[in-house]
């Protein structure tokens, strides 16, 4: 409906456009730009979004990014939404707000994977087709009984990368945070699924890739399982403030190792 209205409004000779309401473009709430300062938009799930009152509460790296980035040089906008996958972040309009807010020179960090693994058409219905192939399929949603086209993890990532570049921004693909699960003294890694798929899309598109998953996992391996518990919040996925700050600092470390201009900020 929105696209139809936009089409009508763009036709100068079409009388019907006078009956349209003013078109509203959704943007990121609370964004205040300062001259000469690029904006970093953080997109993702709860591991990026969360903020809490207590140190050992649930925290996301986007909420504490100020510990790793100089806010006198960049503006930080945490646009992540808890519980979202690439698919639901797009379908619910969260991505549109970011897209409409991007200006040339801005950075968009794209970090998903934890919720993309979920069911596609049952329960929370937020999962995607596994892999990076340019694949789609029509599924019947159990809750609504409506049909919906669902794409692959790689398709959604490539769309995000393309959209950011279309606006003159710089996309940065960030692999998902590691979970606090251990085997034989080493933390669990997802280098065979969502971690490697993020890397593959970066290689396909030429986008900057920060392997946060392994950067943080390497650090926690050195800390050991007992000490690593302090970086998480009572479950295997969500981090405490200490853990969120670690992820933010590892992200900054990855940017520096990649010689990203943003690392100077």
What are these regions (language model features)?
Residues 1-2, 209:
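Ordered, small/hydrophobic-rich secondary-structure cores
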Residues 81-84, 178:
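Acidic, glycine-rich active-site loops and adjacent beta-strand->loop/helix elements
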Residues 86-97:
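N-terminal post-signal-peptidase region of extra-cytosolic proteins
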Residues 46, 85, 115:
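Gly/Ser/Thr-rich beta-alpha loop segments that engage phosphate groups in nucleotides
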Residues 52-56, 88-90, 184-189:
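Short, solvent-exposed loop/turn segments at secondary-structure boundaries
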Residues 97-241, 245, 249-263:
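Alpha-helical cap/lid subdomain in secreted, periplasmic
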Residues 3-81, 96-108, 124-132:
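Serine-esterase "nucleophile elbow" of acetyl-processing enzymes
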Residues 16, 31, 259-265:
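N-terminal charge/polar-biased segments
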